[in-house]
Regions:
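Acidic, low-complexity intrinsically disordered segments
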Residues: 1-172
Length: 172
């Protein structure tokens, strides 16, 4: 193994450990606070995955939107998809986030993490999940968003109750 490859591996591991440490501190603070906030204006905060139609072999861009936002700073969202039909390519941040990190968490599973400097108060797109529709895929395939009880919080570390809406990929 070359020295360059060793440096890349060590840097990648260090970056991953820093991300996990920040996530751990955030989650510990949420669990300690025991506070929960519901969406403002009497509505519900919703994280929804868009639906897309395309043919096999095509690359698709699937939006992940956030509506009913009472003001949120931290996001930890899991996604499940059919790995037999879709190949995960990458994630692009949406207009609501300054940055986000996504890790593959096994076959057909993704985890998105973002921590902003302060509460984001707008509604819009959190991120875009980029996939390729695999050859042989047919029919409909679901992309499921999963938000646990403490997956979204505000600057004051109060958990925000979030409903999720799954998206559908239709193969033409």
């Amino acid at each position: 193994m070359s020295k360059k490859n060793l440096i890349i591996i060590i840097s990648s591991v260090a970056a991953g450990l820093i991300l996990l440490g920040a996530l751990g501190i955030w989650l510990v603070n949420i669990f300690k606070s025991g506070n929960k906030q519901s969406a403002g204006s009497g509505g519900n905060a919703v994280i929804s995955v868009g639906s897309v139609s395309a043919g096999t072999g095509k690359n698709i861009r699937v939006p992940v939107s956030f509506t009913g936002n009472p003001g949120a700073m931290g996001f930890f969202i899991e996604f499940e998809y059919d790995a037999n039909s879709l190949e995960y390519l990458s994630t692009d941040k949406g207009e609501l986030l300054t940055d986000c990190e996504v890790a593959e968490a096994g076959s057909g599973k993704l985890k998105l993490v973002s921590v902003e400097d302060g509460d984001v108060k707008k509604e819009g797109t959190l991120a875009y999940l980029n996939f390729k529709i695999k050859d042989g895929a047919a029919g409909k395939s679901e992309i499921k968003a999963i938000c646990g009880e403490n997956s979204v919080c505000n600057y004051d570390e109060k958990a925000i109750s979030v409903k999720t809406e799954n998206g559908t990929i239709t193969v033409k």
